[in-house]
Amino acid sequence: MKSESHSGGLEPHVNSLALKAILVVDDDQQLASALQWILADENFLVDVAFDGEEALVKIAAHDYDVVICDLKMPKLQGDALYLRAREIRPSLEDRFIFITGYATDPIIRHFLIEQEVKFLVKPFPIGGLINCVRELLG
């Protein structure tokens, strides 16, 4: 009877964060693409949507662990996307990180405070975003 032995090849090392899926939603395609590359380099699976309607379709079809979302976008703004996404996937309620250049706008500020969501003000340090993602994933 022939016996096979494993030659000790490397088993794939899977970081627990490697399987976490992130959706980046921003109408600034350059920023969204840059965030996609940076987060993928940190071993996250990253998908991108360039407006809120596209994001809503993706959220309905896929189970994301974190959504990084701009607030001011065409078609469906970030605050409306957040409220609708929670209806589709209640688990996303505390999994949004908003990125905005308008944090001093009274309406946006009210939304961010009232919903008690995480947010970063553009321009933000990449390390701050990565830390925020890791914190949400706990």
Predicted regions and their residues:
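Alpha4 helix (beta4-alpha4-beta5 surface) of REC/receiver domains from two-component response regulators
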Residues: 80, 93, 102-121, 127, ...
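Non-catalytic signal-transmission and effector/linker regions of two-component phosphorelay proteins
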Residues: 1-21, 87, 109, 125-138
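Active-site residues of response regulator receiver
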Residues: 70
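Receiver (REC) domain active-site loop signature in two-component systems and cognate sites
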Residues: 73
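Charged docking surfaces used in two-component/phosphorelay signaling
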Residues: 33-41
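Acidic catalytic/metal-coordinating carboxylates
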Residues: 50-54, 77-81
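Short hydrophobic/Thr-rich beta-strand motif most characteristic of the beta2 strand and flanking loop
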Residues: 43-50, 58
